[in-house]
Amino acid sequence: MAHAGSGGSAGRGFGGSRWGRSGSGGHEKLPVHVEDALTYLDQVKIRFGSDPATYNGFLEIMKEFKSQSIDTPGVIRRVSQLFHEHPDLIVGFNAFLPLGYRIDIPKNGKLNIQSPLSSQDNSHSHGDCGEDFKQMSYKEDRGQVPLESDSVEFNNAISYVNKIKTRFLDHPEIYRSFLEILHTYQKEQLHTKGRPFRGMSEEEVFTEVANLFRGQEDLLSEFGQFLPEAKRSLFTGNGSCEMNSGQKNEEKSLEHNKKRSRPSLLRPVSAPAKKKMKLRGTKDLSIAAVGKYGTLQEFSFFDKVRRVLKSQEVYENFLRCIALFNQELVSGSELLQLVSPFLGKFPELFAQFKSFLGVKELSFAPPMSDRSGDGISREIDYASCKRIGSSYRALPKTYQQPKCSGRTAICKEVLNDTWVSFPSWSEDSTFVSSKKTPYEEQLHRCEDERFELDVVLETNLATIRVLESVQKKLSRMAPEDQEKLRLDDCLGGTSEVIQRRAIHRIYGDKAPEVIESLKRNPATAVPVVLKRLKAKEEEWREAQQGFNKIWREQYEKAYLKSLDHQAVNFKQNDTKALRSKSLLNEIESVYDEHQEQHSEGRSAPSSEPHLIFVYEDRQILEDAAALISYYVKRQPAIQKEDQGTIRQLLHRFLPSLFFSQQCPGTSDDSADERDRDRDSAEPERRRPTDEKPPADASPEPPKVLDDVYSLFFANNNWYFFLRLHQTLCARLLKIYRQAQKQLLEHRREQEREQLLCEGRREKAADPAMELRLKQPSEVELEEYYPAFLDMVRSLLEGSIDPTQYEDTLREMFTIHAYIGFTMDKLVQNIARQLHHLVSDDVCLKVVELYLNEQQRGAAGGNLSSRCVRAARETSYQWKAERCMADENCFKVMFLQRRGQVIMTIELLDTEEAQTEDPVEVQHLARYVEQYVGSEGASSSSTEGFLLKPVFLQRNLKKFRRWQCEQVRAMRGEAKSSWKRLMGVESACDVDCRFRLGTHKMVFIVNSEDYMYRRGTLCRAKQVQPLVLLRHHRHFEEWHGRWLEDNVTVAAAGLVQDWLMGEEEEDMVPCKTLCETAHVHGLPVTRYRVQYSRRPASP
């Protein structure tokens, strides 16, 4: 599949190799192996051992070329300039140049550079090659056909084939015959290249197609546009005369071979022309012009790809990938990776594409056009086939099965010829969690490399064994018999493929000649080939040992990281989640959800918390305070006074909120603080071992009270600090519990091993330690949590590298270590918030207000007596809202219950209060106090009479007349009302007050209203039977009407039989007894069931 054109393209075609051995410009080059490159590199290294700058410069050139920073002419220019004093190295570099490039150094000392893109050789002085290379210019090959014309011819051919397929949809044999004619013609054209033409002529092709398309004049005339010469000669009658002349035949075949070249999938994309080329019409097309771009199979392949991709833009992107390959910008393996998103879901097309790529490697395989049924298999649309699950498709019944002569009767019965595997790869999934992490990809890549090397070694070893057996056989034969011995295609073994691959890997393009020598003259060829195979075996084994060290290092670096799939994105996500904006958005979103529920009527408006957090271990609070103090103390940006205030908040104010005692050893003295930081490691190191301190070491802690709470109204900064502090405590608790869990598992494992090793004399060692698969840990399991705290301190002060910190955490806590990766960032954010708390006036006022209200008993207490403190807590809330007029107000409660502390946070709605005028609020508060108090009630009774009346005289007359009527009516009802009030006892002692904060009326405890009439209980007892009887009759009447409308007689009988236990199927044998009784004077029927045996318990 080389490209067409007189000059050819630099590098490779669609299936060619990138590098070739040195040779003449027109000769075929042998492939370069890795050992050749290493040998050349060793020569350069030895030559410039005393000049490392030159050697490093050569390596830099190779790196730039590998990264595609420079092209092939640039490599030639720079290498020639670098090795201008060493012509042997320049000549040796020819082995690694692409096909068509060569550097010659004649005796005159001038460089002759041959390039496929230049019309003639460029000669350069050997002494001044650097300046000459700057002036080198490469001209484009003028023999190439313009890209616009190529695409027109290609599309016309594809459109014509599709038109034939659509026209003869009901007669597929005609379409198949047409393809066979063109396949035969194209195959003969390819196989007769360079020899006198003996195949079908264009006239014969046109005649057969005319017979095939009889009655379809439009198709025949359009096909004649591809064969203009054949059509003209056929109608003029000169075709036979030309074919009878042998000399003309030979001349025509030579001219035909000049015009044709090996087809390729796509021509290399050349630079755009300055002028737009005028496109040729379809009347100028010929089958020779179309055939030089590829076979009909390749045309059909691209047509299928265009149909399955559907979008023209996607199809053009697919073509751009192939253009990159033809321009030598990507390799073959990289091209497969580029097209896998396009063809990955179409295995047939992808396999066909790979067969186009590997023409040389698969040269010993039968040609694709000769395979039985290949054209039909490519026409199968697996998307419309019958499915089983998601991985199998059924072949259509019209599919012609390939013939197999080795099958027996039982093979035909049991082997599958219908269902085809149609896998869906996990890499094609868009589900994020199914993707591999970079560390997993690295391990898979190492495994793939090891597997490929093992396959190469085993293939080579298997070939050595086969040839050794042949050599032993030859050693036992006479010389005459050795000359007569011939080997088959398996070369003395049982497999043809293994030996061929091994020999191709070593000898490259010369492998067919070597294999032919082994078949014809094994006595001479076997020893030579066997020696070469054994030398390669030793060389590859040594290389494998070096690779094993590299792979082992990669495994050790990536193994623990590959196990933890959460750590990949944890850092980035955690940084975003701990920002102040994210924390505020979280509670605001919960607040909005509650407001929507209240507005829609799904829940009653009530004061409920928006966020709830639980502190399960009080000791964690001390560890968190110690870490924060350790970092704050070492920050020069925080002044000494602020550091003292922060210590007060951490060790006095926070413990009071969490019902905890002041941390031992904390005081205002900086010396005591330093001693506490230095000695804090000892008590912490004893915690994971569950060792209890002696009784006289510390005083007995006070008894913990349950169901007590603290109330704290906070602003934004305090909310941010409390959230970050809770996050720190939660992560420390997870690490601590994970350390305890691993310690318990280790102790159980030790006890199990001790039981197993009681009968042994020697102590059983850890197999992983014995095999050196596991390194002994530097930290004991009992010290994991204290060691973790020490590592965090070291990370905060910068004495440990973050990468080392993460690797050590992974060794200790495996997949649970990711929680501690951002511990330093979390502590730094907390310290930053603490600095805001001690430097902001509003934050300090919030603390001062809490302490004052705590002394008044308005900031917490016993939960059972909270209603007594309701008015004081409301006053505290009102003061806090006025203090935080420009910020959000958060109601934070700390509830102690069952040894745990529960923190609830509620965002208060202060918008209405903020919109009111403070002066009006003060007047309203004064009015409420006067209205509720006794003084205000007595003084306000006479103030209204001093003002002028606000009503008219005529309305007053009407009102007086209505008032007289009401008085007369009341006098008439007085007697009856007096009778109704006889025997009635009532009291009106209810008391209420106004809440100053919310302006709502609240009823006082132990004040109520009641009314009771004497003798009503006896009368109710007398009337109750009559009421029950009336209700019972109403229900019976309704029930009877419902039964008549909805229940049939048969259904009622079945229910009665079931109730009486007369249906014995699936029932325990029993007997139902009916008893009549009276309840409240009403006759009722009671049913009692007696079982003949006890039913089974559920």
Curated annotation (Swiss-Prot):
One of its GO terms (cellular component) is XY body. Ubiquitinated by RNF220 that leads to proteasomal degradation. The modification Phosphoserine is found at S667, S670. InterPro entries: HDAC_interact_dom, PAH, PAH_sf, Sin3-like, Sin3_C. Residues 1-299 are annotated as: Interaction with CRY1. PROSITE patterns: PAH. Keywords: Nucleus, Phosphoprotein, Repeat, Repressor, Transcription, Transcription regulation, Ubl conjugation. Residues 238-247 have a biased composition (Polar residues). Residues 52-98 are annotated as: Interaction with REST. SUPFAM superfamilies: PAH2 domain. Pfam families: PAH, Sin3_corepress, Sin3a_C. Residues 1-26, 238-274, 661-702 are annotated as: Disordered. Residues 383-550 are annotated as: Interaction with SUDS3 and HDAC1. It comes from the Eukaryota. Residues 30-100, 145-230, 283-360 form the PAH domain. Residues 275-499 are annotated as: Interaction with NCOR1. One of its GO terms (biological process) is negative regulation of cell migration. Residues 1-25 have a biased composition (Gly residues). Acts as a transcriptional repressor. Interacts with MXI1 to repress MYC responsive genes and antagonize MYC oncogenic activities. Interacts with MAD-MAX heterodimers by binding to MAD. The heterodimer then represses transcription by tethering SIN3B to DNA. Also forms a complex with FOXK1 which represses transcription. With FOXK1, regulates cell cycle progression probably by repressing cell cycle inhibitor genes expression. Component of the SIN3B complex, which includes SIN3B, HDAC2 or HDAC1, PHF12 and MORF4L1. Interacts with FOXK1/MNF, MXI, MAD, NCOR1 and SAP30. Interaction with SUDS3 enhances the interaction with HDAC1 to form a complex. Interacts with CRY1, HCFC1, MAD3, MAD4, MAEL, REST, RNF220 and SETDB1. Interacts with C6orf89. Interacts with MYT1L. This is Paired amphipathic helix protein Sin3b. The gene is Sin3b.
